[in-house]
Amino acid sequence: MVSIVLAVSLAGCGIVTVVPIGEEASFTGKEAFDSGAQSSDDWSAVVEDIKGKAADVSEVLANGADGTAVSGSAKIVEFNTETPKHYLVVEVEGYSGGEVRIQAGGVYSGTAIRDAQSVKAFEDFANQTEWSQYAKALNQEADTQVVAPLSIDESVAGKTVTFTGAAAEGGGAVTITPVEMTIE
């Protein structure tokens, strides 16, 4: 009787392979998702896509800007660094609504670039986590490719910014994440 119980209890046992973290691909054949590489590879196409569908910022602001590709020029009122989410406060001619901001370094928030582009769709990713990581990586590309080379500081107040980007509404402000930007 003991041998029957022992045989039944050991029947479900097998050899288990412990896979070290980061080496899963060598066992499954599936490469780990690299949001940085994906966004870097896609960046030029994303920029062209957003540029191709960007509407004039003053027209978009009048009709609601959430998730919209925009382009235009504006006067820089200030470079706000009071929080880690640095941004330019800008004045768009003909618009008297809430504050308009352009993200400008430090910490970026939102998914506006990902949501405004049509190069990649949710279905191109394995799950929501990868889709979210892709949005964050696109924001990082915007910082590296667009904002950081400008070395923005407080001296930009009063200058004109020309931009193309993706707009999102929230908290009484419209925030634009740039994919192209110049300051003169």
Where are each of the predicted segments found?
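Sec-dependent bacterial lipoprotein signal peptides
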Residues: 1-13
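OB-fold and OB-like single-stranded nucleic-acid-recognition modules
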Residues: 11-184
